[in-house]
């Protein structure tokens, strides 16, 4: 679960290394509004640490999709999936990835949310 203020790793080669979540869209879950994001959700992030020659610059605000979470997520078949870290892929205004490579595995839930470009670039889909 990603909340406002959470620091996340980037799973692409956009130039950002660490980002911080600054905005989560409201969604209704069992009649209650949730204030957290999970796999496949688009959040607003700001870059906290970046490479000097990368496309993403420190202090800039981007949209990002959550591709890995440390908190376990239940799947429809009853199994659970969790990762070692929280990671995102930075997106442009058209919700396409800024980077040209995806580093590390991504969850299968990304495909269900319609981010086919990220799934095709990922080395492994779990």
Swiss-Prot record:
What GO molecular function terms would the record report?
large ribosomal subunit rRNA binding; structural constituent of ribosome
One GO biological process term: translation
Which UniProt keywords are listed?
Ribonucleoprotein, Ribosomal protein, RNA-binding, rRNA-binding
Which InterPro entries does the record associate with it? Answer: Ribosomal_uL14, Ribosomal_uL14_bac-type, Ribosomal_uL14_CS, Ribosomal_uL14_sf
Q: Does the keyword S-adenosyl-L-methionine apply?
A: no
Gene3D superfamilies reported for this sequence: Ribosomal protein L14
Q: What does this protein do?
A: Binds to 23S rRNA. Forms part of two intersubunit bridges in the 70S ribosome.
Indicate the quaternary assembly. Answer: Part of the 50S ribosomal subunit. Forms a cluster with proteins L3 and L19. In the 70S ribosome, L14 and L19 interact and together make contacts with the 16S rRNA in bridges B5 and B8.
Family designation: Belongs to the universal ribosomal protein uL14 family.
What is this protein's name?
Large ribosomal subunit protein uL14
């Amino acid at each position: 679960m990603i909340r406002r203020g959470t620091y996340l790793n980037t799973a692409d080669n956009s130039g950002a290394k660490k980002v911080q979540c600054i905005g989560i869209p409201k969604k209704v879950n069992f009649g209650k509004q949730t204030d957290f994001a999970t796999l496949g959700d688009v959040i607003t992030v700001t870059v906290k640490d970046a490479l000097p020659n990368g496309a993403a610059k420190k202090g800039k605000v981007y949209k990002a999709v959550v591709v890995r979470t440390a908190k376990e997520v239940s799947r429809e078949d009853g199994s659970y999936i969790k990762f070692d870290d929280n990671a995102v892929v930075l997106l442009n205004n058209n919700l396409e990835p800024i980077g040209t490579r995806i580093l590390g595995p991504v969850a299968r839930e990304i495909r269900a949310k319609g981010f086919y470009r990220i799934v095709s670039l990922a080395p492994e889909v779990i």
